[in-house]
């Protein structure tokens, strides 16, 4: 099925969805050659790329949202229209809303685990993020005598969680034909202990720390100045980034007191460095920073409350989209990560370039100037992008859950430490 452009999707529903998954009612919109100009019922205005592959278009096609804008007063009829998929024969089929975070339901001990999700938990390889279809298992018959087609042993919810925590991407275990838990669990524990022994003997480098060092070398070798800025920043910096109390992102800020907060991003201090270094150094000014950031993110496989970012930017000459895309390509080729670039928009910068690996967003990149620059005394063209290191590690090592790549006491280099 062909992917419909964004203007067709919003025209069909009369709704817009923000990056936080909030549904807004559209009061008026106009479509130019490549842009959509949108006025929401709540009074907000937006200019976005008319893309087939942006995050909002994907969410519209999958009929996913988190909540509705209270000021827009989205009606039940509007929501039902959003949740209804029209076929070519004009038949309507209701689809289920999938909201994040996903709630796991407890499984009774007497219930056997369904084959499909079990297969998914072990089918990923470290070198690829390609989705695979899982064949349906053959139905067993009373007279069946073939051991391979026998049903899987029953697993309780706690046993299932334990097995998933012990599995690694390299394990070639089909869980719908697995051994009983009392045999499988000690076998996996032994494998993980052997992994730790090899790691301690041969490597001893933490994945996250090594990636930070590799990224630092990449940018320093290309003429970028490394920055190390404070983790505690003035709350005023967040407001100057356009994050006021009325925005969803404001609710994600870890505030220490009324004047200080943990930085949710690296951009504010990099803005300050660009302005100050422009008075000192010849152009173009090229800087980068690798460091931790903090947000009250929803729990899930793609988000962390403490995460590590790399932001790089260049100001002055040579700040074109072509040069930005070339640098991003060189960076991700250096890390051996496949990607594609699609247009999108965000609350802070407006138009952005999303760097995607499959359905996983690795980065948002910007070609300045943007209206926000005036708040920071920047009046020259610039380019920049930010990447989450844990997401990069998730792709590089084939982890199912981003927590395996994070600062953690439960995992080391993706290996469970609870052995």
Curated annotation (Swiss-Prot):
One of the protein's GO biological processes: tRNA aminoacylation for protein translation
Its EC number(s): 6.1.1.26
Subcellular location: Cytoplasm
Keyword ATP-binding found: yes
Keyword field: Aminoacyl-tRNA synthetase, ATP-binding, Cytoplasm, Ligase, Nucleotide-binding, Protein biosynthesis
Annotated segments matching region Disordered: 100-157
Source organism, top-level taxon: Archaea
PROSITE patterns: AA_TRNA_LIGASE_II (PS50862)
Segments passing through the bilayer: none
Pfam families recorded: tRNA-synt_2d (PF01409)
GO CC list: cytoplasm
Keyword Aminoacyl-tRNA synthetase assigned: yes
Comp. bias (Polar residues): 120-141
Entry's family note: Belongs to the class-II aminoacyl-tRNA synthetase family.
HAMAP family: Pyl_tRNA_synth
Entry protein name: Pyrrolysine--tRNA ligase
Species, as recorded: Methanosarcina barkeri
């Amino acid at each position: 099925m062909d992917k419909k452009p964004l203007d067709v999707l919003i025209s069909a529903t009369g709704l817009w969805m923000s990056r936080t998954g909030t549904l807004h009612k559209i009061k008026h919109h106009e479509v130019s050659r490549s842009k959509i100009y949108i006025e929401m019922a709540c009074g907000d205005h937006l200019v976005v790329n008319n893309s087939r592959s942006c995050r909002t278009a994907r969410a519209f096609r999958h009929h996913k949202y988190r909540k509705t804008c209270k000021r827009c007063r989205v009606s039940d009829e509007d929501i039902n229209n959003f949740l209804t998929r029209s076929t070519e024969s004009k038949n309507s089929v209701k689809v289920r809303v999938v909201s994040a975070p996903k709630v796991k339901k407890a499984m009774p001990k007497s219930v056997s685990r369904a084959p499909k999700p079990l297969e998914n938990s072990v089918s990923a390889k470290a070198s690829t993020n390609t989705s695979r279809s899982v064949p349906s298992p053959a139905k067993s018959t009373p007279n069946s005598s073939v051991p391979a087609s026998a049903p899987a042993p029953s697993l309780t919810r706690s046993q299932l969680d334990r097995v998933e925590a012990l599995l690694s991407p390299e394990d070639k275990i089909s869980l719908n034909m697995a051994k009983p838990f009392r045999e499988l669990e000690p076998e996996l524990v032994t494998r993980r202990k052997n992994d730790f022994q090899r790691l301690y003997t041969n490597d001893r480098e933490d994945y996250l720390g090594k990636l930070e060092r590799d990224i630092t070398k990449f940018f320093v070798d290309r003429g970028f100045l490394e920055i190390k800025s404070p983790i505690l920043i003035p709350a005023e910096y967040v407001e100057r980034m356009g994050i006021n109390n009325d925005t969803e992102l404001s609710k994600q800020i870890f505030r220490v007191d009324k004047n200080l907060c943990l930085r949710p991003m690296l951009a504010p201090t990099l803005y300050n460095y660009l302005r100050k270094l422009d008075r000192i150094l010849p152009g173009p000014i090229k800087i980068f920073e690798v460091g931790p950031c903090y947000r009250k993110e929803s729990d899930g496989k793609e988000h962390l409350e403490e995460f590590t970012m790399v932001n790089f930017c260049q100001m002055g000459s040579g700040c074109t989209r072509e040069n930005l895309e070339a640098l991003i390509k060189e960076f991700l080729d250096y890390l051996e990560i496949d990607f594609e670039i699609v247009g999108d928009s965000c609350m802070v910068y407006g138009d952005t370039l999303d760097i995607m690996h499959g359905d996983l967003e690795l980065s948002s990149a910007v070609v300045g100037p943007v209206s926000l620059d005036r708040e920071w005394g920047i009046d020259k063209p610039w380019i920049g992008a930010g990447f989450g290191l844990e997401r990069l590690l998730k792709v590089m090592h084939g982890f199912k859950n981003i927590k395996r790549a994070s600062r953690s006491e439960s995992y080391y280099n993706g290996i469970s430490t609870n052995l």
